[in-house]
Amino acid sequence: MLKFQTVRGSLRLLAIRRTSTATAASPNVRRLEYKPIKKVMVANRGEIAIRVFRACTELGIRTVAVYSEQDTGQMHRQKADEAYLIGRGLAPVQAYLHIPDIIKVAKENNVDAVHPGYGFLSERADFAQACQDAGVRFIGPSPEVVRKMGDKVEARAIAIAAGVPVVPGTDAPITSLHEAHEFSNTYGFPIIFKAAYGGGGRGMRVVHSYEELEENYTRAYSEALAAFGNGALFVEKFIEKPRHIEVQILGDQYGNILHLYERDCSIQRRHQKVVEIAPAAHLDPQLRTRLTSDSVKLAKQVGYENAGTVEFLVDRHGKHYFIEVNSRLQVEHTVTEEITDVDLVHAQIHVAEGRSLPDLGLRQENIRINGCAIQCRVTTEDPARSFQPDTGRIEVFRSGEGMGIRLDNASAFQGAVISPHYDSLLVKVIAHGKDHPTAATKMSRALAEFRVRGVKTNIPFLQNVLNNQQFLAGTVDTQFIDENPELFQLRPAQNRAQKLLHYLGHVMVNGPTTPIPVKASPSPTDPIVPVVPIGPPPTGFRDILLREGPEGFARAVRNHEGLLLMDTTFRDAHQSLLATRVRTHDLKKISPYVAHSFNKLFSIENWGGATFDVAMRFLYECPWRRLQELRELVPNIPFQMLLRGANAVGYTNYPDNVVFKFCEVAKENGMDIFRVFDSLNYLPNLLLGMEAAGSAGGVVEAAISYTGDVSDPSRTKYSLQYYMGLAEELVRAGTHILCIKDMAGLLKPTACTMLVSSLRDRFPDLPLHIHTHDTSGAGVAAMLACAHAGADVVDVAADSMSGMTSQPSMGALVACTRGTPLDTGVPLERVFDYSEYWEGARGLYAAFDCTATMKSGNSDVYENEIPGGQYTNLHFQAHSMGLGSKFKEVKKAYVEANQMLGDLIKVTPSSKIVGDLAQFMVQNGLTRAEAEAQAEELSFPRSVVEFLQGYIGIPHGGFPEPLRSKVLKDLPRVEGRPGASLPPLDLQALEKELTERHGEEVTPEDVLSAAMYPDVFAHFKDFTATFGPLDSLNTRLFLQGPKIAEEFEVELERGKTLHIKALAISDLNRAGQRQVFFELNGQLRSILVKDTQAMKEMHFHPKALKDVKGQIGAPMPGKVIDIKVAAGAKVTKGQPLCVLSAMKMETVVTSPVEGTVRKVHVTKDMTLEGDDLILEIE
């Protein structure tokens, strides 16, 4: 660095003495007049313009910027002392190609010299000549040299004359496709088209066969014309797997030429450089000498002055071929500056002033390589979508800096808008270290520090390159990216903070994302979490299970003295009272207290049933993640889930392998006890669920769903003998525990005594578990009767979450058995604290609380037999539709519907079938008799029809006739177990499909969620990809968002806490958006949120639906430049449909399917946003 500072210091000193005459370089060097430059205009934009402005400022030179109408907000115009608009009314690129405007600005503002930067006019001889004709110096080679070097065919001829080896190719630009055919016939494939008047990858296309020739010729010509104003092409033999090595040269007006060694630019995509290295690693010294000497020789051949680059291909045998000269500064000039300590822009300006290289202290023998430098081009491109350019507003920009890191950027800042009009380069990151691995480490660290939000970037891809062993070894060629597909295994950025801000802003603008049934706000205060002792929780029944296995666990339960309790607060209680809406956030907060205080519980019911799909559908949480997190917090108490037999946790039948895999993965994630039931007590379904749970290593708890009344001799269908017979079958099948599942709360104390004592007498060694609901108000009495009759376990809920359609009170059972042989051992004072927490938590869910419409339970449940959760739902639905006064009729219809279907056992999904039929009868004003009489003409609910077809199994006593025959007519009927005929689901294929659909690592848990609920899972993944980890938000923020000026904290993980303050919401803009302002960790953040209500009244181009294969969307924002098909056209898979242009690159959109074009939604020259619908194929 000392040498670097010395050289730059000397250059600044020279700037001060601008009025003096240059000292002679040597006695034999010809003398030129020194003309100091006082004002420089950069005929370019972006980071290269700023790079030149900075150099000029260091030399005391005034700077002038030019900008297009589209660049009014770009940083380069602000970095200059003066800035002027050019190309008014022209297309974005054409503005910077408009020579008359640029010369006019230079003349009118007394500009001494023009720096062309790179790209645009930098290699146009007519521009260099126009500057010279106007009396303005061109900081670069003479117009004649620019013309010769810019014409790649002439440059090739010069190289041949200089004795520099070249690649076989045409001697002049080709003018027709026919000439390309002739060259291919002579030299064979592969060949490459190259733009004759520019580089940077534009106008380059590799062709491997005659079939590809015409399309690639057309595209290359079009790209060259758009980028350089001239579509001329030449064609060369394509050398496969070469290294791309370029040599930096520098010349003065005195004939001095020197080189600054080489750069390795082999890491390319579509012939565009991605990562550049200086010097080239593991380059043979003799090859380096040949490359540098040939470069100097070629420069001397044409009298080259100023900075330039000579590019070569080096084949695998070490033979080099000249390909072109870039008569300008290169994008990657930075790495050469870092390793040679030479400021190339300073040198360019001084040479243009008339100084000699020796004057500047630049002699070949003094140029030494110091360490290694790497440059990464951070672009707004999406590597996961073939590097398609992304556009939009940068919401967050934080760069990586530190020792050995240099950043060259332009409009890389929060609030900057990335348009589709220009190059996608965001910032150049340059790392300098003592050697290649050190520079790579510094670069990797710097990129890891970057935070860019609002647009996609290629940073994840660059990080993969930097960590690649081949790259670290330094031996790469131009096929490096193509031959390392693992580079595209991208780790998605978590981006949690910004996603959460998007969610909060969305809720603030549009309201809750989950349907809110009641207009009630969450409690403004958080529930109080009781004090938790320090240290691990005491041992519990799970420790026995882990030590002795399911059989040993069952023995321990049976041998336990006193009554055991299962707490349903984490699942069934809130399913019954709060529409299953309790979030993981609130479950986690109380979990450590439960682990420490209730270690004597038999189990905690916390998973399965409706909680699985509701978590994804309405709470936007992963149910598996809930299980994993709760397991970590409660290691000592067994977890229990509700498994719907062959239906697992869904509402339909699944292939057997899905049910088995589900149980296996649930067990791996921490589930212990599988309470297996079937809504019809259909034995084949029960046995399948039991087998799946048992094979997974879980505790099998077979559950008999209870209905009727065994204490009533007149109720003969579901008699004591029925239940005893079914119990015999389940015990014979190997259940570890037997459960009576009383989902409606129909067990009266007398019936409890009869049923439980009979089971205890028949199965003295088998643990008995009783589940009920407290709808009638007799739940506590019933559970006490069960306990006295010999039950080992009964279900309870926290006091504040008990009663009504939930389970009986935990505190009541604990108090009633205290000091008796049935003592639960649960500390009553801990129950009080637990209840207080849930009382506070329940207030957060006021919008879902059943007490909004239902004030008490009702003993009429003994007549209508409606299950607890369904009773709550039906009651609320009736009131929400203004039919609260008719709820009695709904209950009456439920009784009639049940009898009409043959008196079913009613639990999900059979209870839903009865409920659907009941509502159908009420809505149509039908009695049971009328519905049965008109059965052949009525359109019954789908669930009823499928039940009668046998899709959920066969009910006890068979299907009701003649109703079944009347309804089904000729519809097919399922014989036997419904899932038995289903072929196994290809889970590996599903995993592959999900990976393609969601573009990230898919877990076995994800696969099973998608197998159970494909549409719900897809929506959940899309939602969380947009809005992030919502379970870190407290429930009030989740439901209604923050108030303006509210400050709060969000803990993402241990040690990572966000400090957020909501600041303001803007008025509606023309795009139907509102800007929402936050303060995040002390920094201002703003996001744009679509106002969904306002947008209903505005017209926007339709978006392609990702799940509809025939809908073809724009892969990137851009302009339609060609449409290749029309409505009615037949297309094949892979056939080009249209061509988009963005950031000076063209992309051909191809058909993903075979079919017929139904409708074309775009026209030529239309500007599209990403995913805008292009056309539909059917």
UniProtKB/Swiss-Prot annotation:
Domain Biotinyl-binding residue range list: 1109-1178
Pathway: Carbohydrate biosynthesis; gluconeogenesis
Positions of post-translational N6-succinyllysine modification: 79, 442
Annotated positions binding substrate: 571-575, 644, 908
Domain Biotin carboxylation: 36-486
Occurrences of domain Pyruvate carboxyltransferase (ranges): 563-832
Taxonomic superkingdom: Eukaryota
Catalysed reactions, as listed in the record: hydrogencarbonate + pyruvate + ATP = oxaloacetate + ADP + phosphate + H(+)
UniProt function note: Pyruvate carboxylase catalyzes a 2-step reaction, involving the ATP-dependent carboxylation of the covalently attached biotin in the first step and the transfer of the carboxyl group to pyruvate in the second. Catalyzes in a tissue specific manner, the initial reactions of glucose (liver, kidney) and lipid (adipose tissue, liver, brain) synthesis from pyruvate.
Subunit structure: Homotetramer. Interacts (via the biotin carboxylation domain) with SIRT4.
Protein name per Swiss-Prot or TrEMBL: Pyruvate carboxylase, mitochondrial
Organism: Bos taurus (Bovine)
Gene: PC
